[in-house]
Amino acid sequence: MWPGHEEVGHGGATLPQVDELLAVDMGCVGDDLSCTERQVSICAKDNGGPYDYGMVTRLVELARANAIPYAVDIYPHYSSDITVAWHAGMDARGALIGPGVHASHGMERTHFEGMKATIDLVALYLELD
């Protein structure tokens, strides 16, 4: 899922029932976070609660095994389309990843390496060649 409406609270509300959701959004960069603009962020938990442990573990293992630069962070003031889907009644495992982004909403900045790391991790997760 490539979110587009999580900020207004309906991005994942009308999805068909699936077993698993992988949202690709932005990863936060900040003083109290591990991620940089050159990494893919794997979010373990946000304001909506923890993401699926099995999915998060698989993402970390894929990144580590394939030398993809990554960081695992917790975003207590952040929410994704997966949270919206859960609130709409979907019973699915979920995980959230994205390139590290500095200064969200004002003038978002990331790096090509962070974008590449995110795309590479999505491709591995989906078992694309």
PLM regions: where:
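Active-site-adjacent substrate-binding region
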Residues: S41-D129
